[in-house]
Amino acid sequence: MDNKAARLRRATRARKQIKELGANRLVVHRTPRHIYAQLIAPNGSEVLAAASTAEKSVREGLKSTGNVDAAKVVGKTIAERAIEKGVKNVSFDRSGFKYHGRVAALADAAREAGLQF
């Protein structure tokens, strides 16, 4: 099994457990160039908030969009947008990625900005 298939298998297993909880999901996806975060409703059919380094407003002031500093900005932005929508408690869905580096930086920044998970 290649790395991508293994990651997707881990992600599917984690999503199944999160759906049973019935909580809002903070989903993270990373590529070498960008990092994306979405806040998805418990039913899975509605995106409540989103932020990524592909957005011009987030990208301003960043030297690079594929590093830990950029992930921190995305984490802070998604937390602010979630709180505007009235969401404070979420389940963190790392999409099978290791909780390390950019994924961990995004999560820590979101926690510092007021999200609870």
Curated annotation (Swiss-Prot):
Species of the source: Idiomarina loihiensis (strain ATCC BAA-735 / DSM 15497 / L2-TR)
Q: Does the keyword Lipid biosynthesis apply?
A: no
User: Can you state the subunit structure given in the record?
Assistant: Part of the 50S ribosomal subunit; part of the 5S rRNA/L5/L18/L25 subcomplex. Contacts the 5S and 23S rRNAs.
Q: GO CC: one term?
A: cytosolic large ribosomal subunit
Keyword list (alphabetical) reads: Ribonucleoprotein, Ribosomal protein, RNA-binding, rRNA-binding
Q: What does this protein do?
A: This is one of the proteins that bind and probably mediate the attachment of the 5S RNA into the large ribosomal subunit, where it forms part of the central protuberance.
Protein name (record)? Large ribosomal subunit protein uL18
Question: For this UniProt entry, which segments traverse the membrane?
Answer: none
BP-aspect Gene Ontology terms: translation
Instruction: Please give the family membership noted in the entry.
Output: Belongs to the universal ribosomal protein uL18 family.
**Listed GO MF terms:** 5S rRNA binding; structural constituent of ribosome
